[in-house]
Amino acid sequence: MRIHYLLFTLLFLFLVPVPGHGGIINTLQKYYCRVRGGRCAVLSCLPKEEQIGKCSTRGRKCCRRKK
């Protein structure tokens, strides 16, 4: 039973995001952007694209072609 407590603690520590980094959150946002048919743009979307969300907590935009 003691090993369960240790494993749970280690899992919890790996899943808690570090302030300012947000590794797991950024990964989920990128995945969600691709599921919606978008791409992650560094600065801004291209002229024929629209912003449909964010890819990271640092300001990358999720863009897809206008319909």
From Swiss-Prot:
Pfam families hit by this protein: Defensin_beta
This protein's UniProt keywords: Antibiotic, Antimicrobial, Defensin, Disulfide bond, Secreted, Signal
GO molecular function, one term: chemoattractant activity
Cellular location(s): Secreted
Keyword Electron transport listed: no
Entry keyword Disulfide bond: yes
Cystine residue pairs: 33-62, 40-55, 45-63
One Gene Ontology term, aspect cellular component: extracellular space
GO biological process, one term: cell chemotaxis
SUPFAM superfamilies (alphabetical): Defensin-like (SSF57392)
Signal peptide: 1-22
Function summary: Exhibits antimicrobial activity against Gram-positive and Gram-negative bacteria.
Family classification: Belongs to the beta-defensin family.
Protein name: Beta-defensin 103A
Species the sequence originates in: Gorilla gorilla gorilla (Western lowland gorilla)
Gene field: DEFB103A
